[in-house]
């Protein structure tokens, strides 16, 4: 079966997490992703957070599936020639270098366009144009500068970053959409273009509901926040609201049976207005259906703490899965707090390919997250990440059409090997 992006060739200069997230997704959809790596070193994450000695780390393997690896010294004259040929034959160049790195390599946008006018150059940066555009950005910096940290945590505590990698992986997903959109536009224009995704912008996009709340705040208190019911005044900016729901439907994380010893024995419970009477039945508070302080959503806002305290009395008598089974029968929105161990062992996630087991030649079997997007006509077959330089000769011969003699010349030039250090005097 053909894949959605069959025939699309990606020149992948990305590293660490944000860029590899993007190119891995494109590879899962069938693009031929050629990962260009520094000879002898490769992507820095190959050696970061290693759990086993002398093998590629899970940090690397889980972000670089379905790709091919070529090692290339782009400072070497022969290496520059090879890179020029790759630019000629590829559709997209993806990079997450610091500002100006491509220019210093000798391949600014104008030169790339002269080599291949159809090439799309896609970049991830920390910030867009402005006072911070030259600053180095990592995941947590992006969360802090994009509005996520200031609105995450509890009101009386410090800002918090989230466990979800919304800065790195989130921006990578944004860039992938931009690339596919640019490829589609190229079918009508016939030319390439630049695609840029800034990490600050990506995080802000994912926290847009907080920008919504910032504007609402100018017209009065945010009544769905628990501090409204507690009579605590709001300040000038959207506050941290703990586990209050951000969608206008009051919700909290509540303890379940076993919470004293299990750090994840909790459930998220939403008191959705259409099922309020069912909630009253479940927790055995039938009078709340008609009580003036509880019957209407607006009236309940001032009593959320006492309402959820009563609901928690009920959830603490059930395991999180027992509570979920009961609540689902009444169509009450809820969800158990699932640990990474529980997710890794969930058979339904294995069945859908959301969690996959991958065989690797040096580290053996490991688990990874598969493609979260399912296409009926382009199913994803997750293949292991490449070893460093594993496909170098294959790419030189099959993609660029070099002869054995030409490949030997490139090897002899040192373009595929670590730069030689000068001998000590």
From Swiss-Prot:
It catalyses: formyl-CoA + oxalate = oxalyl-CoA + formate. Coiled coil: none annotated. It comes from the Bacteria. InterPro entries: CoA-transferase_III_domain, CoA-Trfase_fam_III, CoA-Trfase_III_dom3_sf, CoA-Trfase_III_dom_1_sf, Formyl_CoA_transfer. It holds the Pfam family CoA_transf_3. Substrate binds at residues 247-249. It is an enzyme of class 2 (transferase). GO terms for molecular function: formyl-CoA transferase activity. Its EC number is 2.8.3.16. Pathway: Metabolic intermediate degradation; oxalate degradation; CO(2) and formate from oxalate: step 1/2. The keyword Transferase applies. CoA binds at residues 17-18, 38, 72-75, 96-98, 104, 136-139. The active site is at 168 (nucleophile). One of its GO terms (biological process) is oxalate catabolic process. Belongs to the CoA-transferase III family. Frc subfamily. Homodimer. This is Formyl-CoA:oxalate CoA-transferase.
């Amino acid at each position: 079966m053909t894949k959605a992006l069959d025939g699309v060739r990606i020149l992948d200069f990305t590293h660490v997490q944000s860029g590899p997230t993007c190119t891995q997704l494109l590879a899962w959809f069938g693009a031929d992703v050629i990962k260009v790596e520094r000879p002898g070193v490769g992507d820095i994450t190959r050696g970061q957070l290693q759990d086993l000695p002398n093998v590629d780390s899970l940090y690397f393997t889980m972000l670089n599936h379905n790709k091919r690896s070529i090692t290339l010294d782009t400072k070497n004259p022969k290496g520059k020639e090879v890179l020029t040929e790759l630019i000629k034959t590829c559709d997209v160049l993806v990079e997450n270098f610091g500002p100006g790195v491509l220019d210093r390599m000798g391949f600014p946008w104008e030169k790339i366009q002269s080599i291949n006018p159809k090439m799309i150059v896609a970049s991830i940066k920390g910030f867009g144009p402005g006072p911070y555009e030259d600053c180095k950005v990592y995941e947590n910096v992006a969360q802090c500068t994009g509005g996520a940290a200031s609105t995450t945590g509890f009101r009386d505590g410090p800002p918090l970053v989230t466990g979800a990698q919304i800065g790195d992986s989130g921006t990578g997903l944004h860039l992938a959409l931009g690339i596919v959109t640019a490829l589609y536009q190229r079918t009508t224009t016939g030319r390439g273009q630049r695609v840029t995704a800034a990490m600050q912008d990506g995080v802000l996009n994912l926290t847009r509901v907080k920008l919504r709340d910032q504007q609402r705040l100018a017209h009065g208190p945010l009544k769905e926040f628990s501090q409204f019911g507690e009579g605590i005044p709001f300040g000038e900016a959207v506050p941290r609201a703990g586990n209050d729901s951000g969608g206008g439907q009051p919700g909290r994380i509540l303890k379940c049976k076993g919470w004293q010893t299990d750090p994840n024995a909790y459930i998220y419970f939403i008191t959705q207005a259409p099922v309020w009477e069912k909630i009253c039945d479940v927790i055995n508070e039938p009078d709340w259906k008609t009580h003036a302080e509880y019957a209407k959503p607006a009236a309940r806002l001032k009593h959320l703490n006492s309402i959820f305290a009563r609901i928690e009395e009920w959830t603490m008598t059930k395991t999180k899965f027992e509570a979920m089974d009961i609540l689902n029968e009444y169509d009450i929105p809820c969800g158990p707090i699932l640990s990474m161990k529980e997710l890794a062992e969930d058979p339904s996630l294995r069945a859908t390919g959301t969690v996959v087991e991958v065989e690797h030649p040096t580290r053996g079997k490991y688990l990874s997250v598969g493609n979260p997007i399912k296409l009926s006509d382009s199913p994803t077959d997750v293949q292991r990440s490449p070893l460093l330089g594993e496909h170098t000769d294959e790419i030189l011969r099959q993609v660029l059409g070099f002869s054995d003699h030409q490949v030997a010349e490139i090897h002899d030039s040192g373009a595929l090997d670590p730069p030689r250090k000068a001998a000590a005097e």
